[in-house]
């Protein structure tokens, strides 16, 4: 592998000083590379993955690729295959380390080249520290069976919120289509897709955020037995709330921030669960713009929240990092990992966020410019976000 491309100079290397670095995980290329995820391994290595191929759902050559950054190194290792379902596109991978230090890879295999037919898959590994490529020791599919309460919740939610003026023309036909589709047991069991890291509650419960392009809503897969069995939460209903990112407040409430796949004004959507992910409030607009693009929110070790997002209504040409000191009531500080003119042809999208054991924040995202496409890795600390320079 070539040396990583250092795009920004190191501004400081100790706590209390601003720090930002950016690297390309691999050289720019013509292939479509997108939807990355990053995780820190127990030994301090970083592992990243993304999907790679000639397209997305309609390209059967798409597979999951990965790379490892060993602790203390400034160069990502050789790219390797992580998952490939023969003759089907594999997309939207998510990496996660559970409380037992088991490595999980969640992703979707797209059947019939349609998002709404996607199959939710996972594989796990306990042998991944001393090898470049994880040795996977288990693989299965996750099949959720939302019951009649699923359709009842959707219908009730739309009936309660249908009269809001901003939805006057759009919502009635939209909501009727969703309500009717929700009554079909077969449709309810397929098409649930990954995008953002799961979270683990103090009880050990795992919450895996999912969404459906068919229903244009979200849901959470819940496991209370370390991922051996999964069941569906009540749906997160709204006008296009998809790709949820979950974060838990000090009072136990869980907030889902979501991409806006609905009507204007384009805003990040927000829903709250007060019962550990079982049920969710109707998704509402926040003040933060969103051009129908993925986001991620992360709770830092000190309790502050960080959000990575495209903060425009129509372009993915800038990637903002927002900081909240009050659990998302307001986002007081903003800094840009990259900011370009809307018509520049440069896109920065689909962030994945973690905080490593040394306190640094790691971000991977899709970068496209005139050189081609790559997955970018940015490293920064909270002081960099706070620094106005």
Question: Over which residues does each language-model region extend?
Answer:
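Universal eukaryotic N-terminal targeting presequences
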Residues: 1-2, 16
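Asp-box/BNR beta-propeller blade signature and adjacent active/binding-site loops
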Residues: 14-389
């Amino acid at each position: 592998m070539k040396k990583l491309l250092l795009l920004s100079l190191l501004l400081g290397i100790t706590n209390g000083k601003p720090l930002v670095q950016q690297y390309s995980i691999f050289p720019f290329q013509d292939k479509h590379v997108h939807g990355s995820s990053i995780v820190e391994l127990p030994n301090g290595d970083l592992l990243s993955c993304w999907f790679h191929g000639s397209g997305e759902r309609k390209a059967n050559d798409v597979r999951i690729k990965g790379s490892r950054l060993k602790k203390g190194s400034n160069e990502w290792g050789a790219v390797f295959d992580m998952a490939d379902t023969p003759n089907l596109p594999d997309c939207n991978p998510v990496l996660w380390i559970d409380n037992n230090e088991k490595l999980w890879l969640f992703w979707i295999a797209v059947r019939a080249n349609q998002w709404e037919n996607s199959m939710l898959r996972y594989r796990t590994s306990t042998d991944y520290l001393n090898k470049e490529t994880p040795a996977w020791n288990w693989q299965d599919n996750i099949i959720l069976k939302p019951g009649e309460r699923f359709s009842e919740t959707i219908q009730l939610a739309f009936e309660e919120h249908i009269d809001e003026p901003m939805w006057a023309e759009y919502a009635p036909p939209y909501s009727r289509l969703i309500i009717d589709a929700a009554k079909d047991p077969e449709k309810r069991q397929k098409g649930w897709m990954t995008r953002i890291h799961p979270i683990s509650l103090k009880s050990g419960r795992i919450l895996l955020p999912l969404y459906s392009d068919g229903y244009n809503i979200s849901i959470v897969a819940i496991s209370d037995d370390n991922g051996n069995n999964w069941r569906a939460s009540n749906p997160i209903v709204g006008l296009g709330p998809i790709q949820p990112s979950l974060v838990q407040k000090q009072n136990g409430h869980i907030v889902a921030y979501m991409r806006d796949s609905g009507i204007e004004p384009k805003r990040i959507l927000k829903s709250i669960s007060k019962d550990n992910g079982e049920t969710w409030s109707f998704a509402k607009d926040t003040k933060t713009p969103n051009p129908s693009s993925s986001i991620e929110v992360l709770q830092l070790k000190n309790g502050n929240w960080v959000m990575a997002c495209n903060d425009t209504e129509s372009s993915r040409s800038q990637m903002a990092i927002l900081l909240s000191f009050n659990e998302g009531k307001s986002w007081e500080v903003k800094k840009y990992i990259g900011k370009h003119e809307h018509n520049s042809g440069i896109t920065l999208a689909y962030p994945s966020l973690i905080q490593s054991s040394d306190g640094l924040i790691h971000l991977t995202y899709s970068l496209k410019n005139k050189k081609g496409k790559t997955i970018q890795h940015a490293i920064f600390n909270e002081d960099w976000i706070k620094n106005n320079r």
